[in-house]
Structure formats: C-alpha cells, structure tokens
Amino acid sequence: ALETLKMFEKKDSRVKSAAATNLSFLYYLENELAQAANYADLAVNSDRYNPAALTNKGNTVFANGDYEKAAEFYKEALRNDCSCTEALYNLGLTYKKLNRIDEALDCFLKLHAILRNSAQVLQQIANIYELMEDPNQAIEWLMQLISVVPTDPHVLSKLGKLYDNEGDKSQAFHYYYESYRYFPSNIEVIEWLGAYCID
C-alpha cells in the first residue's frame, strides 16, 4: 500500500495531496511521527485547502504536544470544510487538553448535532459535564449513551458512581448491578455491591 501511494507523489497537486495525506495517516497509525509529519507537510503544501491534510497535520502536531498549533490546523480544516467531523472532534479533544472546557463542550455539542448516535461524542460530552462538576447533565448524557451502547459495563458503572455520589443508592445499585452482569471482574463494582448488601 505504501509503495502504491508513493507512486502518486509525482502526480498533480490534488492527487499528491491525497496520497500524502493517506501516507501521513498510515505512518501516524504506525507511530512513526517524523514520517507522518513529513507527509502531512507535503499534503498541506500540495493542497492548502484539503481538510484531511490539515487534520493530519494537526494530529502530528498534537502528538508532539503543541496543542495550540494543533488547534489552529483543526480550525483551518473547518474553515475549508465546516462538515469535517474529524477536525471538529480533534479540536474538541485539543481544547480539553488545553483546559478550555467550554470551547471543548461547544465542539462536541456541534458534533452531536451532526452525529446524533455517536457513542464517542456522547461519552465526551458526559465527561466534560463531569469535569464541570455538573453530575445531572453528566447523567443525562450517559443515559443517552447507554441507549446507543446498552451493554457497556464501564458506562453503566460510571452511572452507578454518579448516582451514588448524588445519594441515590437504589439507582446506583441498579447500574452497578447491570455493570456487574456484563463485566463481573470489575473489583470496584464488586466492592460497591458487597458494601451495599452489607448495609
């Protein structure tokens, strides 16, 4: 696959940009960040308006820890194609890294409007509300999440924990027990259920 993509490097700028974008992504997945960055640069230089190339460039910059610069690449990708969900998702993650929680939430809420049943987006929104110390909103978004992935034991145990923190032991028991049914090896869940039964 790499050899085939490398053949396209000699083509016109759009084809070269697409090939370099794919090569950058492949190297990124293989954790060869230097090569990924080189091909991301080639992709962006070949076609500055390619949102996938800009997103890949943002990913390589993000992986090197320069979150502000990564955010700029993601924003540029979105200016070129406002429907680039990868750039919007990664911009939200970048804002979370930068502790710009309100901006991260805004990104994920926009994504939710586009991708209504995306488990990843719902989980990010719930997590942000948890970071904002708003357990009621976190619970509401986790409830939407379990309508998409009803057997996820980690989401169920997270709901149990939030209800427990809110003092609702019966709901906490329900979600911890559901979590236990799907993943009976989680020690934290077993300990909570044991303590609940002793009380």
Locations of regions flagged by a protein language model:
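Structural marker of alpha-solenoid helical repeat scaffolds
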Residues: K11-D12, S46, N80, I114-L115, ...
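Register position in tetratricopeptide repeats
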Residues: L29, A63-N64, K97, L131, ...
